[in-house]
């Protein structure tokens, strides 16, 4: 999955390290927005399901975050309140990042966002995306919840950051 965006920057001769730094700024903007529970259109993420769910002890969901607080079954744990209940009861919420209060912030084990990185960079372009351990899952989540990308307001914010860092404006 590829997202392309154009930045209206002054004509500059940029180096690979500078382009990598710009890509890191974009990652930071996106991650902060995700922790606030917003997609790339700055809309709140759709709420997690309240439909009853069984988390199998052999599932990848179980491996990412061991279920806690549900009703124990022989091969699984039942959460009558759905995925929303599973997530709320099972994870240890960290509010270390200011504004990380959203119920839907795409953070379960943290593995997906830890693997959301700068994949490649040259002096003219860069690619951000997900590393192999989470690619399939992460890009599926992105199709459903749209987190990879920037809103116009964020693009404008990024342009101002780049201008300030490179031109001292």
What are these language model-derived features?
Residues 1-169:
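Short, Lys/Arg-rich flexible segments
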């Amino acid at each position: 999955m590829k997202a392309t965006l154009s930045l209206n920057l002054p004509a500059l001769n940029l180096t690979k390290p500078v382009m990598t730094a710009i890509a890191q700024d974009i990652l930071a903007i996106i991650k902060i927005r995700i922790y606030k529970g917003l997609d790339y259109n700055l809309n709140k993420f759709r709420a997690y399901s309240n439909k009853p769910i069984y988390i199998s002890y052999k599932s990848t969901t179980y491996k990412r975050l061991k279920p806690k607080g549900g009703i124990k079954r022989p091969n699984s744990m039942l959460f009558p309140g759905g995925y929303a209940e599973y997530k709320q009861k099972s994870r240890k919420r960290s509010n270390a990042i200011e504004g990380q209060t959203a119920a839907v912030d795409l953070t379960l084990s943290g593995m997906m966002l830890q693997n959301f990185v700068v994949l490649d960079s040259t002096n003219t372009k860069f690619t951000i995306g997900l590393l192999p351990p989470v690619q399939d899952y992460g890009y599926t989540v992105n199709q459903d919840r749209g987190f990879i990308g920037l809103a116009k307001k964020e693009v404008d914010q990024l342009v101002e950051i780049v201008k300030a860092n490179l031109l001292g404006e």
